[in-house]
UniProtKB/Swiss-Prot annotation:
Its EC number is 4.3.3.6. It comes from Listeria welshimeri serovar 6b (strain ATCC 35897 / DSM 20650 / CCUG 15529 / CIP 8149 / NCTC 11857 / SLCC 5334 / V8). InterPro entries: Aldolase_TIM, PdxS/SNZ, PdxS/SNZ_N, RibuloseP-bd_barrel. Disulfide bonds: none annotated. D-glyceraldehyde 3-phosphate binds at residue 166. One of its GO terms (biological process) is amino acid metabolic process. In the presence of PdxT, forms a dodecamer of heterodimers. Catalyzes the formation of pyridoxal 5'-phosphate from ribose 5-phosphate (RBP), glyceraldehyde 3-phosphate (G3P) and ammonia. The ammonia is provided by the PdxT subunit. Can also use ribulose 5-phosphate and dihydroxyacetone phosphate as substrates, resulting from enzyme-catalyzed isomerization of RBP and G3P, respectively. This is Pyridoxal 5'-phosphate synthase subunit PdxS. Gene3D superfamilies: Aldolase class I (3.20.20.70). GO terms for molecular function: pyridoxal 5'-phosphate synthase (glutamine hydrolysing) activity. D-ribose 5-phosphate binds at residues 25, 154, 215, 236-237.
């Protein structure tokens, strides 16, 4: 019997439907409803948000399926869930449950420190993180339908997401400006599939959407990432670690949509209460940097 898989075109098309929107981390049905009411285009069902994963330490695994099911039953928007890098069984379980997307995520403790999942073998579309064009194209080559910056999850610090978005977009501009005979060397230097490097030169952009993630903590952070070329925004710990999650979630959505309306963003940012405290990058030990968990 032939194995059933989704085509790249279908998977990428599904991801394109989320373009311009906000995807929010939630840990229960109540939070999922708040996210949906605020205008989120999708939710990420988790057992713990990244800041709590970071604080707790230990091994972080796929969420309890009960939590994922509760979220799926509570909302009408797409539901995503995270699987550990390289953990075939976690991903297959989530696919069997009927989640709309799987995030092969460095936020969870990697199950395989050498190989990512061959995402083209699955029917469900995958989301993956990247810091540069090499990581981006390797994940697309494996079958990812959506990318996101890795940033530094659970810190409330936008600096790494900014770095990663600028890096990817700068390298895209380099590729677009290359002659055809330079592309093979570029593919080798980036550690990226040659055919995908050629596709970027032809399209002038990535063949999949690239969202901002990892450190988005305020409406201004979300708007900044859209200004820098993000196709949308993931918000992890920022919303439900704030003083007023419903108001904060709505402000993030509006700031993402109207990211050049600075007067509106200023109004949205008033009286939101305190955002999550955040962590300065220099205070993180190297072993605590989630973004370094995969290449």
């Amino acid at each position: 019997m032939e194995k059933k898989v989704g085509t790249d075109r279908v998977k990428r098309g599904m991801a394109q439907m989320q373009k311009g929107g906000v995807i929010m981390d939630v840990v229960n049905a109540e939070q999922a409803k708040i996210a949906e009411d605020a205008g989120a285009v999708a939710v990420m069902a988790l057992e713990r948000v990244p800041s709590d994963i970071r604080a707790a330490g230990g091994v972080a695994r796929m969420a309890d399926p009960r939590i994922v099911e509760e979220v799926m039953n509570a909302v009408s928007i797409p539901v995503m869930a995270k699987a550990r890098i390289g953990h075939i069984t976690e991903a297959r379980v989530l696919e069997a449950m009927g989640v709309d997307y799987i995030d092969e995520s460095e936020v969870l403790t990697p199950a395989d420190d050498e190989f990512h999942l061959l995402k083209s073998d699955f029917t469900v579309p995958f989301v993956c993180g990247c810091r540069d064009i090499g990581e981006a194209l390797r994940r697309i080559g494996e079958g990812a339908a959506m990318l996101r910056t890795k940033g530094e999850p659970g810190t409330g610090n936008i600096v790494e997401a900014v770095r990663h978005m600028r890096q990817v977009n700068g390298q895209i501009r380099q590729i677009v400006g290359m002659t055809d005979d330079e592309l093979m060397v570029a593919a080798k230097n980036f550690g990226a599939p040659y055919e995908l490097v050629k596709e970027i030169k032809s399209l002038g952009k990535l063949p999949v959407v690239n969202f901002a993630a990892g450190g988005v903590a305020t409406p201004s952070d979300a708007a900044l990432m859209m200004e820098l070329g993000a196709d949308g925004v993931f918000v992890g710990s920022g919303i439900f670690k704030s003083d007023n999650p419903a108001k904060f979630a709505s402000a993030i959505v509006q700031a993402t949509t109207y990211y050049t309306d600075y007067e509106l963003i200023g109004k949205l940012s008033k009286e939101l209460g305190s955002p999550m405290k955040g962590i300065e990058m220099s205070r993180l030990n190297p072993e605590d940097r989630m973004q370094d968990r995969s290449v």
